[in-house]
């Protein structure tokens, strides 16, 4: 203290606490004023003073001194309640995962902070001399944060990656931690069990790699002679004075500095504190300094480009190993801070916002023009203030004004009533914590399987134009519509089509059948079906076998030969619907093993489901026309007028279409039974040709004849055909052309044995053999078939109670399958006559096709199959029926029918089974979806377990509507309708009927003719969204009309239409907990599928909220599996205040990995530069200059990135250390494959200067481009293979070096250490015998004064040294 005493008159006495920062400043000023010797003497005295005071105080620390804060319990309870509420909001889809994490962190951080702030007053009041209290503010050991962990709560911890663990440690160290809290604490704490080893090794490995890259960099020369420099300017305000000073001190000027005409500093002068202060004072022009980047050599560095040595304030000495110093300077802070004994233990530190609260109850008023709506970072709605906003709170007798600063959130609305102490605004935390912010990505993963939907527009990310990455422009929900996905590994599986009905669980059980990709599709199909339909399954759980499937979906096989003969009249069927036909198919019978439609109708639908006009839709095989035995057909025909000009059966785009040349009327026709046996050639036949046998004669070893008669044997194509003609044989004297039918009562009257025939007979003339001339006559019995009336197929269809225009119709057509008048049929089961349904619609319509699809509905075990046919959509004009009112809103301006845009398929069942609310959970609809793997097709099975019904809402009040309850006898089978997705939802509306009323209270029911309908059936009032997203409405009656464009209810009045807002609209996504009825919120989120008067049916869905800028992975409608990445958020988060959170960042920058939200653009920038420069300068110089400019640009960017990380952690590292490292990782270029050169192979990494020199020597362009190497890759691409081998991959490096015959010139330190030589630094450094002559430098310097650009170009292109 004597020194201070000596200069007392000039000193000011400071009476304040000196903390660590003040002590640093004090020591710094001592060194400046008195030098190092005096300073150390003074500090010794300060140390002694401190020890004496501490001894006198004799403070000790016992466990009883740790006093827990009393208010902790209820503060923690409050935080837990907020967390539970937050979890609910996230589940409802009100906040997304990042907002939830952020808010959770801030809830606990605020709780922790309140506790910390309460700690000091608590100690001050209860025990002011508590040793813990005294120590925590002494600045010597420990701080408030650590004491808070002892007596408050440990709070939130960060894991080794710096991510926050959102489970807080609620205990403090005095109370002790639970097991979970201890493990979290181990992860987060700097001294934790887990952390210490990890961090030390990380920092050590980083140092090792850094040293490896630059170990050969030694100061070899005094001056390399460069004229280039990097300009530094404080003028633009981008650089703080502190950073500006730090950048300049210790550097060497690359050019003279002038103020006006006066030179205040010369080239090659090193910069000290005085010179820097002069620059700042005079605000000199941009200052050009020399840096390691501007040094001309890549393998060493010169004194002037390096500058002053950090150890002693003088130019660095020759032979100094500056590379190793640089590597250790960057790696060391990580190691040092990892091993620090005193730390807050990884506890999260961040800023919270200040709240403005209302001082009393009152009404809020502010200018709404100065705010705009937004979301807070917690997902709450708020107003953002763009500038100072004055908010007035008015009570009865008090008016209070509050000024809200800009960038703050206003949490209340204008004219809202607020209570005392209610938070009305949130002022963002000051910018002090901004340097602890970083941008990170957060991936959200799907926790359920299903189909992806979103309800907003999305943009393609520019770099992924054809990918499945989409950017959200605004806040919206992503929905996962639930359903069980099933993925086939074999590519398109042809047995399932979109909208097929399936058993939902059977596929998942049998997945293993479709796992081997080597088997063919047919094998799989066979296995697939044999596994399902072998009869092991319970009845009712099966789907048709393969042949039946072919019949149902008509794979092209058709049983029609010549369908040329039509039955007389073509009746129109009873069932006519506007643009659609619904055909229900009967359920399978008990014990039967085949799926048949009602009455044996076979439906033939092409695979693509598209039917043309006059297509055969279905055929019916009447059992009366089925013969179990083989035989021949015979009939006589009469030609009628031709009905269609086209000829015969035409196959048009895979659809069989009836276009017969003429129509024949047949009445009656005949079947002649003949027994036929088809035998193998090797069979031993026991009867002879032309022999006559009796009934039950042995024909072969294992066959007997069923009838007696004439035997004929024919050989055909390795088969033997054995035919037995029953009947009598006659040998008439005179044979005419005896091929004729004799009706009953016929015969020769003059014959002796004349008797009246009872049955039809067929007379056939035959020869015994081909060569004989003699004939005999075979008289055979005949089975006659009379023309019957077409079966009444009308009973297939429900009665059409809804009056509609007749657009789509079916015709019944009978025809004989076998057109040839005498045709042998050798099948054992023959259908002689087939009844067809032919699809037709009005000729004046321009529609060319109709779409058909199968629907299978199951209700409590009862299966109903339906075929649905819709005409393709087209703007059909709608003519109003006579009951339509003029203002009904059905006819739009352009005259097109609004209802036609969404044709509804109403599906009805007359089954008497009681339908309950419980649904069969195992039946579902297959929905074919897009899969990320292009080769395989994904199916999603939507079963009724994924749907739920909400309602009935009997208390919903519609204006102007009176409800009449119609009591029905519940035992009467009700007319019900089956819903979508194969579920048996009873979508009927049982006891509500709406009358419409005009203003004068006159019932308009009579006008609408609803009274009669009431007696017949219950009007269905519901709307349906099918699996394809089309909206259907049953157009049941005119009392409630859906406008598909606005999706609002319309209530119809006598002369005007009043629109009332809808409660829910079709296809709308509802979040959980949304109130849609008075009963309270509904309990599931999902999409509205069916809209009824009293209830809605929704398909379960899981909402995920996403904010603008989020990246959505996947396409609309794509299947997502559990655990798939759904969306990626990019958000800012507060960083833990430890250096090593930054260490991985440093490593990422130096290893040139992507760290930004949008990947690090340096490499893209490099490609862009190369292209532009080549275009501007042409080939020869373009590569060199392009690479050079790119490298300069990326070097500065990399240095700034590394410095930003370290500065944010409060660590000071001189730029030159980072520059030496960055110079090494940016000094190589990659030889490209644009043009082959004789010197370097494509893909080879070479130094930029070497490439340029080689190109100049060869006088040809070498194509290359700049690359950014990471430090690891740079270490493996040096001139020394010994150095590379000692780093990693030793065997590979040595083997490659041996093969290439590489030479190591032992220029670096490491290779000399390995071989035991003297290292070329320090005393082992050989000074060059003579400094090279400086003429080029002088010339270049003069040139630069004349023309700066010319000098720089010459420097780049010509002046280089090895």
From Swiss-Prot:
Q: Which reaction does it catalyse?
A: RNA(n) + a ribonucleoside 5'-triphosphate = RNA(n+1) + diphosphate
The cellular component terms of Gene Ontology attached to this UniProt record, alphabetical and capped at eight, are: chloroplast; DNA-directed RNA polymerase complex; mitochondrion
Give the InterPro entries listed for this entry. DNA-dir_RpoC2_beta_pp (IPR012756), RNA_pol_beta''_euk (IPR050254), RNA_pol_Rpb1_3_sf (IPR042102), RNA_pol_Rpb1_4 (IPR007083), RNA_pol_Rpb1_5 (IPR007081), Rpb1_funnel_sf (IPR038120)
What residues bind Zn(2+), as annotated?
Answer: 224, 295, 302, 305
Protein location: Plastid, Chloroplast
What enzyme category does the UniProt record give? transferase
Q: Which GO terms describe its molecular function?
A: DNA binding; DNA-directed RNA polymerase activity; zinc ion binding
Q: Which domain of life is it from?
A: Eukaryota
**NCBIfam families of this UniProt entry?**
rpoC2_cyan
Q: Could you tell me what this protein is called?
A: DNA-directed RNA polymerase subunit beta''
- The species this protein belongs to is Helianthus annuus (Common sunflower)
What gene codes for this chain? rpoC2
